[in-house]
């Protein structure tokens, strides 16, 4: 049992010091004459821990050990002179590795700071980092605050975007729309279904919000149980070790050895008349206290398309306004197939179009004027709801980052491979960092790994490559690895082979659902082992299909391994094992039947 290197080593050595120095302990402090009142492995470990404790309390000047002004110390360990005997070495203790770790001043023993770590942001990244840091012996506070939305004043509890206004409510409403579709398909499968069945928006919103509030509550309890101090306040830096927290009851100044910025982002609003006064964003949609009705969704990223998709499935009339391209950053062949599948379902797309203004009419409806950016032609239409989905902005403005000396790039924070900013004791994780995937699982893992490096002696870094993701449109799109365009750009068109095919889900046949856009492809190297660089899939339960293949891709999946894997029949996932036609061949990738 390697007690000196365990995650609780700091606490352990403190307790051991008390035992070793207590007159009633019955343990002689002379290393060579430990009594037999305790088993040998305990006595030797206690002696080792006592030595570690003395060194930890005395040693300063290493990276991570600073005085209250932030200056590094310069004192050598006691007893480190030329004539000092070598320290006791436990046979199972990697002392060299342990000594190489940063030495922190523990605030619980009169150190210079209120906390070892303050995490700014109570979302996925911040919570994961805070809880993991506590498990590794740090004293942690988590600062969290939500500004009300400008149009409706929407607020929410702890948990960040994903829990409150992102992944969770989005997936629930997507599921509600799929259930509505399934109900209408049920008649083809022999079910007697009332033709007048329709969703109740208010009941759906209430159910979604009840679930969110339960998650908020569980999260608060979890933070309390794990001894993370939760501070509901807006934080701004005074200097690199001091934060001013604005609370409901006033202000509070708090200090920490280390800060992790995990504030995430919020939706952008266009700079046009009426945008803020009358438009809403995804921050408002999932708690909207009225039916959305005829809705203009401005923006064709994944948020805009997902919202338009479930609104259509719930019986409303969405229109998508696209300034340039659909699903920027994704494989564009797949993106256009997704858009085409939505148009087939009756969702209009206004291409190459931007909004000019939003006006509220006497009847409460919204008059939107817009323009085609290619022809200059202007037009207008009336909607019940205007939903802005034009991108997100990092929440850096309220942090007063210049006071701490932290660099900002395009409202995001640039970091190195260890999530460190340009300031030695300040880190950033999650959606706030520049140039990394803005996905909840990425944020969670990055936050945990950062805490383990800071307080657990780990060296593992976050791997941001080949991260799988899913767009929850009516016909879902999931992918992992490189898009076809990026693979060509990185390796050259002559070095890339694309295996592709359309397929026919068995469950689509009886209700006679369209299979026109059920498509998948594997982007691979053309020669050699034909390693797979990217996998792309459009169809039902896309996220469930791609997850396992994501692990295979990260493990070095090749085309030969893929096509020689025996598939599970009949499933849509097995279609990846049947990819045999390349784009270069020019052959028709459309199957004759579900089993061909």
UniProtKB/Swiss-Prot annotation:
Gene Ontology molecular functions: antioxidant activity; flavin adenine dinucleotide binding; protein homodimerization activity; thioredoxin-disulfide reductase (NADPH) activity
- Per the Swiss-Prot or TrEMBL record, the active site comprises 569 (proton acceptor)
* Cystine crosslinks: 162-167, 594-595
Supply the SUPFAM superfamilies for this chain.
FAD/NAD(P)-binding domain (SSF51905), FAD/NAD-linked reductases, dimerisation (C-terminal) domain (SSF55424)
What does the entry list under GO cellular component? cytoplasm; cytosol; mitochondrion
Q: Please give the catalytic activity noted in the UniProt record.
A: [thioredoxin]-dithiol + NADP(+) = [thioredoxin]-disulfide + NADPH + H(+)
List, separated by semicolons, the cofactors it needs: FAD
- The EC number of this protein is 1.8.1.9
Residues bound to FAD: 120-126, 143-147, 159-170, 233-235, 262-266, 282, 286, 302, 392-399, 429-432, 438-443, 472, 570
Which residues does the annotation say bind NADP(+)? Answer: 322-328, 355
Q: In which tissues is it expressed?
A: During embryogenesis, expression is seen in germ cell progenitors, developing midgut, hindgut and proventriculus.
Q: Where is the signal peptide?
A: none
Sorted alphabetically, the Gene Ontology BP terms of this entry are: cell redox homeostasis; determination of adult lifespan
Q: What class of enzyme is it?
A: oxidoreductase
Q: Where is the composition biased (Low complexity)?
A: 68-79
Q: Where is this region: Disordered?
A: 59-87
Return the cofactor note field: Binds 1 FAD per subunit.
Record's keyword annotation contains Isomerase: no
Miscellaneous note, as given in the UniProt record, is: The active site is a redox-active disulfide bond.
What is the recorded function of this protein according to its Swiss-Prot or TrEMBL entry?
A: Thioredoxin system is a major player in glutathione metabolism, due to the demonstrated absence of a glutathione reductase. Functionally interacts with the Sod/Cat reactive oxidation species (ROS) defense system and thereby has a role in preadult development and life span. Lack of a glutathione reductase suggests antioxidant defense in Drosophila, and probably in related insects, differs fundamentally from that in other organisms.
For this chain, the family text in UniProt reads: Belongs to the class-I pyridine nucleotide-disulfide oxidoreductase family.
This protein's name: Thioredoxin reductase 1, mitochondrial
Source species of the chain = Drosophila melanogaster
Gene name, please?
Trxr1
């Amino acid at each position: 049992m390697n007690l000196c290197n365990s995650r609780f080593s700091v606490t352990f050595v403190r307790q051991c010091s008390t035992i070793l120095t207590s007159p009633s302990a019955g343990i002689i402090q002379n290393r060579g004459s430990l009594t037999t009142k305790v088993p040998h492995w305990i006595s030797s470990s206690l002696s080792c821990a006592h030595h570690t404790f003395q060194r930890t309390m005395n040693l300063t000047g290493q990276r991570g050990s600073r005085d209250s002004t932030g200056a590094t110390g310069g004192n050598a360990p006691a007893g480190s002179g030329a004539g000092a005997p070598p320290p006791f070495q436990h046979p199972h203790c990697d002392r060299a590795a342990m000594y190489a770790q940063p030495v922190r001043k523990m605030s619980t023993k009169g150190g210079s700071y209120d906390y070892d770590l303050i995490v700014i942001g109570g979302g996925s990244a911040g919570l994961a980092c805070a809880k993991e840091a506590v498990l590794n012996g740090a004293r942690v506070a988590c600062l969290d605050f939500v500004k009300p939305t400008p149009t409706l004043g929407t607020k929410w509890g702890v948990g960040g975007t994903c829990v409150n206004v992102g992944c969770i409510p989005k997936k629930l409403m997507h599921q509600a729309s799929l259930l509505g579709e399934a109900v209408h398909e049920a008649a083809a499968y022999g079910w007697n279904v009332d033709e007048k069945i329709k969703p109740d928006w208010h009941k759906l919103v209430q159910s979604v919000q009840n679930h969110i509030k339960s998650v908020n509550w569980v999260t608060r309890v979890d933070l309390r149980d794990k001894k993370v101090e939760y501070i509901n306040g807006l934080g701004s830096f005074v200097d690199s070790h001091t934060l001013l927290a604005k609370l409901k009851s006033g202000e509070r100044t708090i200090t920490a050895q280390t800060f992790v910025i995990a504030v995430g982002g919020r939706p952008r609003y266009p700079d046009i008349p009426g945008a803020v006064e009358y438009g809403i964003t995804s921050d408002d949609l999932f708690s909207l206290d009225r039916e959305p009705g005829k809705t203009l969704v401005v923006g064709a990223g994944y948020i805009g398309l997902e919202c338009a998709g479930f609104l259509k499935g719930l019986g409303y009339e969405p229109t998508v306004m696209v300034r340039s391209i659909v699903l920027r950053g994704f494989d564009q062949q797949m993106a256009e197939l997704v858009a085409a599948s939505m148009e087939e379902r009756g969702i209009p797309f206004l291409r190459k179009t931007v909004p000019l203004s939003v006006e509220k009419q006497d009847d409460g409806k919204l008059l939107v004027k817009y323009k085609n950016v290619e022809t200059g032609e202007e037009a207008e239409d009336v909607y019940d709801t205007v939903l802005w989905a034009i991108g997100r902005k990092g929440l850096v403005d309220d942090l007063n980052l210049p006071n701490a000396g932290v660099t900002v790039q395009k409202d995001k924070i640039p970091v190195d491979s260890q999530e460190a900013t340009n300031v030695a004791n300040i880190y950033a994780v999650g959606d706030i960092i520049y140039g990394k995937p803005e996905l909840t699982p990425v944020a969670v893992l990055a936050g945990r790994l950062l805490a383990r490096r800071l307080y657990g002696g780990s060296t593992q870094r976050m791997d941001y490559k080949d991260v799988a993701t899913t767009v929850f449109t009516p016909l879902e799109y999931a992918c992992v690895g490189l898009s076809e365009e990026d693979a060509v750009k990185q390796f050259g068109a002559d070095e890339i082979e694309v295996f592709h095919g359309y397929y026919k889900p068995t469950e689509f046949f009886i209700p006679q659902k369209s299979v026109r856009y059920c498509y998948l492809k594997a982007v691979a190297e053309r020669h050699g082992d034909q390693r797979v660089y990217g996998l792309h899939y459009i169809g039902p339960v896309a996220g469930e299909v791609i997850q396992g293949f994501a692990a295979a891709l990260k493990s070095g999946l090749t085309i030969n391994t893929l096509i020689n894997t025996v598939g599970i029949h009949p499933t849509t996932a097995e279609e990846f094992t049947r990819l045999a036609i390349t784009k270069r061949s020019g052959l028709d990738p459309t199957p004759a039947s579900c089993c061909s």
